[in-house]
Amino acid sequence: MDKTYSPAAIEQDLYQQWEDKGYFKPSGKGDPYSIMIPPPNVTGSLHMGHAFQHTIMDTLTRYQRMDGLNTLWQVGSDHAGIATQMVVERQLAAQGQTRQELGRDAFIDKIWEWKEQSGGTITQQMRRLGDSVDWDRERFTMDEGLSDAVREVFVKLHEDNLIYRGKRLVNWDPALQTAISDLEVENKEQQGYIWYLRYPLADGEKTEDGKDHLVVATTRPETMLGDVCVAVHPDDERFAHLVGKFLELPIVNRRIPIVADHHVDSEFGTGCVKVTPAHDFNDYEIGKRHQTGMISIFDDTAHVMAKAGLYTSTGETLEELNGFNGILPEQYAGKERFEARKQLVAEFDELGLLEKIEKHTNKIPYGDRGGVPIEPHLTDQWYVRVEPMAKQATAAVEDGRIEFVPKQYENMYFSWMRDIQDWCISRQLWWGHRIPAWYDEQGNVYVGRTEEEVREKHNLGDTPLQQDEDVLDTWFSSALWTFSTLGWPKNTEDLKTFHPTDVLVTGFDIIFFWVARMIMMTMHFMKDEEGQPQVPFKKVYVTGLIRDEEGQKMSKSKGNVLDPLDMIDGISADELVAKRTANLMQPKMREKIEKRTRKEFPEGITAHGTDALRFTLTALASTGRDINWDMKRLEGYRNFCNKLWNASRYVLMSTEEHDCGLENDDMTLSLADEWIIARFNSTVKDFRQALDTYRFDQAAAIAYEFTWNQFCDWYLELTKPVLQNGTESQQRGTRHTLVNVLEQLLRLLHPVMPYITETIWQRVKPLVGNTDDTIMLQPFPRVEDNVSHQAMQDMEWLKRVILAIRNIRGEMDLSPNKPLPLLLSNADAMAKGRIQNNESFLSSLAKLESIEFIESDDDAPASMTALVDTLKLHIPMAGLIDKEAELQRLQKSIEKANKEWQRLNGKLSNDNFVSKAPEAVIAKEREKLSEAETTLKQLQEQQDKIKAL
């Protein structure tokens, strides 16, 4: 084996071999086990969140495959409506073209062209991560098969009266001119204002304090053109006498009523709220409660219309509303919403109706793609009536057919499902699944799988029909992911075998948008043999977010994004800066981002390889909590890979070209051999338990502890005295144990660290008589019954003796190479037997020149001592240390440690520092203070021991 472990030299070739040989395919044998990959956006590239989830899924898949299950990890990508359309529109814009000039069909062809060229980025990155997915079954949400499933679902839901078209309030992106989902809305905190406007009371009414007007407080004065009433709280005595009376709406000169509604917060502003149901979600609900009707004043680009749209509170069109014909003041027609705001405020001021303006910090909803404030907008959209489906989907989690890990996320799921609103599924885009609905010239709607089907079903002959221009929300097709990818609506063998799937690995942020909708759709359309609704998956493993080292969310605008491939391959500081500062939305951040990046990564990022990255992600995967990324852990696990590599080289050098007991079973196992076999067995048990309960962090800790501490640090050292001085039978036994434990350890580690384990295994397999092609298809280690528990106890006791001697060496600052005499008193028969039977291990690992039993402590000269149970260890100090010199050395160390303690204590007692420093900095300083206290205490104890000699 090469002297040093070089991931770059092995990873890509190995993956290609695995893929070419079809190892990722279901075996067709054993019980089925399936995981559906959450389909990443076809536009995207893998980020740390993907790397994290994919590591978890691949670990589970490889583990179950090795455990003999018929595993399918289903791969695919999402067409990502808005995101993809924008990418291609930007490319067109760079060539001076728009999609409108190109036309719908040509534009969609362009997107398919782009998808063929660039859609592969993400799949290549998945290969780099070692994802063992079945690439031959790769799906795309716009594939013909999946499109059939989407049309089928739409038609059936429509037939079941669960899909309807209606005019409702939606999040509208005026830049992209489409409805968008709540997930695509980003609330940004901004400095804004509250305007206090006077609305005159009609019919000579007066307020309690004799005023002839009410003052309304608003953050959106421009929407007053569409006001339908003013609301006050029913318990607000100031306005009780005015409920049911009227106001004169300024500028528009309409009479609007004063209503009482519990939604009003009497403490905010003046306690009087203007209500514009067509332009605010809360107002929409108030309008519905009071049947006020709605006045829509903006067009799709958020400009004021000359004539407002008038509607009932349920969305039916009206010619007039309470005598108002919809004509808006002409000075505002065609004005952009924020321009209209300025003009309206100025006009209120001129009319003497502007009471005051106050500064106010506001959360403004922005579209995450269009980058402009979202407008609540009344439009005709298609909706799914989800309440009936939600009941069934809630019950599936309540009765345990679906389990969330960790369980606390079930409450989040329930709170959404019990307050569920109808789902807006139409989008005003061109890229996506076009809605299978057609209109005749009279506006009648016909829903069907194809135009031919619609004509035939409704006897339309050659009546002109126009297909709906809109496409479906991307989440609509991804809600069908678990069954559409397996061939539904056909009843395929795959569907019968792999559905329901076993586990879904996903982020908490899409429990509602994706997980809940998958459960609803699947249970509505998939039935088992008894005709009972089928769930899409039995477990939902919910991951937290991966944040940067300071706990900040990773984002392009903050310039703190880490690319998993940069951890694998490495990147220079200059390249990293260039990457983080390219295409910034706010170019002024460039300098700040560069400064931060160079401070954090002065030398760039070194290559760590895929296995180190995967092991780090696994080790950080504590259930359901956000993870603060830690480069030091990554470096530590890169060292872990080196440790495994070097340990394997030692094993191979000690066993290749030697008899490892394959041909000759005349073997004697040492205590160390029996102990490591038993230790490994308990490691297998604990590791399996951790993976079976989704405690990936524990699994990583168990594997690390055994590999580094027990196998490398202890067992390999314990083999040296046997291999140097043991009998032929003993040497054969130790070599046999070395190769067999290493081979099984590689199998245990393989699901998390596939590359390094496969590479080493190929060298080890002939030594254990294995001729198979790959570690991937080897059985995962099982828990054995026939291990020696006595060997475990004996060896653990001997380790305590060795550690006690090493501690004395450390305390006395003695060279690790200096052989020491050991005197033992108070030894019972068991201790004596353990020492005498294992003198070679003790002498070698504790570096002893002699071992002698004495009758009592009185027979020992001046010594440093330690206790192991009742056994007392004495290391005579004569000739080993100069007492005075050692006391002087310790005194200097104590003074230095005391100085450091005083410095840190002073800093933390300084109120100025504590009040201004970030929490993370204070925590670090407290940690240092605690370490300084421990050091000081240890030095003082050591000084007392030397004085007592």
Curated annotation (Swiss-Prot):
It catalyses: tRNA(Val) + L-valine + ATP = L-valyl-tRNA(Val) + AMP + diphosphate. Keywords: Aminoacyl-tRNA synthetase, ATP-binding, Coiled coil, Cytoplasm, Ligase, Nucleotide-binding, Protein biosynthesis. A motif ('HIGH' region) lies at residues 40-50. It holds the Pfam family Anticodon_1. Its main location: cytoplasm. Gene3D superfamilies: HUPs (3.40.50.620), Isoleucyl-tRNA Synthetase, Domain 1 (1.10.730.10), Valyl-tRNA synthetase, C-terminal domain (1.10.287.380), Valyl/Leucyl/Isoleucyl-tRNA synthetase, editing domain (3.90.740.10). Residues 877-949 form a coiled coil. The keyword Coiled coil applies. ATP binds at residue 556. InterPro entries: aa-tRNA-synth_I_CS, aa-tRNA-synth_Ia, Anticodon_Ia_Val, M/V/L/I-tRNA-synth_anticd-bd, Rossmann-like_a/b/a_fold, tRNA-bd_arm, tRNAsynth_Ia_anticodon-bd, Val-tRNA_synth_C_sf. The keyword Cytoplasm applies. A motif ('KMSKS' region) lies at residues 553-557. One of its GO terms (cellular component) is cytosol. Monomer. ValRS has two distinct active sites: one for aminoacylation and one for editing. The misactivated threonine is translocated from the active site to the editing site. Belongs to the class-I aminoacyl-tRNA synthetase family. ValS type 1 subfamily. This is Valine--tRNA ligase. It comes from Idiomarina loihiensis (strain ATCC BAA-735 / DSM 15497 / L2-TR).
